[in-house]
């Protein structure tokens, strides 16, 4: 990150990752997904201080840097790529927001551009105070500044689909001035790299198709999102005993019903 063109992206330098890995290896019992599966199926206890390594979003760095370090230590990890950006070589809305904020430090200008975009689409902007009240409740635990939280709330939650995707693309094109497909190929894993990771003992799970907040979707739209994700996993012969990590940690009872019907072993969330 330090030597890249995007130096304010929130990521971890390789040296710090190696230090963290060595700390975990020394102080915890790093386990595999098979050990968790056996524990759940046979109702046996895991060893004390057990630790499972998981990596979301399917970044190319996971193949280039993470996998080799895990293999050096004879440990495995679980990787959860989102499907659409790998299939269609686009950039997820979440990552577009990260790079927009990296390239344009003036939050007021971003907010102005968002408002102008919405106006151009004849989308009425409600009272700003009401928006602030809503996002404060939802994003209160974020460490970003108030304006950054506001921007993320607008682009991730408040603006409806498909308008929010169009808005993210508009801002991404304006501030980064790059070819999205080529940018995506450099950012995310390729199918070949995913297969190499599987061949080297890594576990691949589902992370949605478009990386949407499942808990905000209707049953019908969740089912569509999960079916598309499963079609992606089948390309790697992942058909049974599959696992999932919820994008944003978001899910509801409908999500759990669908996963049960689809024979999902279990799913991970960022929230209890």
Where in the sequence are the language-model features?
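Catalytic alpha-helical scaffold of carbohydrate-active enzymes acting on polysaccharides/glycoconjugates
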Residues: 1-243, 248-272
């Amino acid at each position: 990150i330090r030597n890249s063109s995007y130096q304010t992206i929130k990521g971890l330098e390789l040296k710090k990752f190696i230090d963290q890995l060595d700390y975990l290896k020394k102080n915890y019992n790093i386990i595999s997904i098979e050990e968790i599966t056996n524990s759940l199926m046979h109702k046996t206890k895991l060893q004390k201080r057990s630790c499972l390594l998981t990596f979301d979003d399917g970044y190319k760095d996971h193949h280039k840097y993470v996998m080799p370090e895990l293999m050096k230590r004879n440990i495995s990890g679980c990787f959860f790529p989102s499907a659409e950006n790998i299939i269609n070589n686009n950039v997820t809305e979440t990552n577009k927001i990260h790079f927009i904020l990296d390239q344009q430090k003036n939050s007021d200008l971003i907010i102005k551009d968002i408002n102008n975009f919405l106006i151009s689409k004849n989308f009425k902007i409600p009272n700003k105070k009401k928006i602030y009240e809503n996002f404060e409740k939802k994003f209160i635990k974020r460490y970003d500044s108030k304006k950054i939280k506001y921007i993320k709330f607008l682009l991730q939650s408040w603006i409806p689909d498909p308008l929010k995707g169009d808005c993210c693309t508009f801002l991404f094109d304006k501030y980064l001035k790059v070819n999205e497909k080529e940018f995506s190929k450099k950012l995310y894993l390729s199918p070949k790299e995913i297969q190499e990771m599987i061949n080297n003992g890594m576990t691949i799970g589902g992370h949605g198709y478009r990386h949407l907040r499942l808990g905000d979707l209707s049953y019908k739209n969740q089912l569509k999102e999960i079916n598309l994700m499963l079609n992606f996993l089948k390309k790697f012969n992942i058909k049974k005993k599959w696992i999932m990590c919820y994008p944003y940690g978001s899910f509801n009872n409908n999500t759990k019903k669908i996963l049960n019907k689809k024979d999902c072993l279990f799913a991970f969330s960022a929230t209890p």
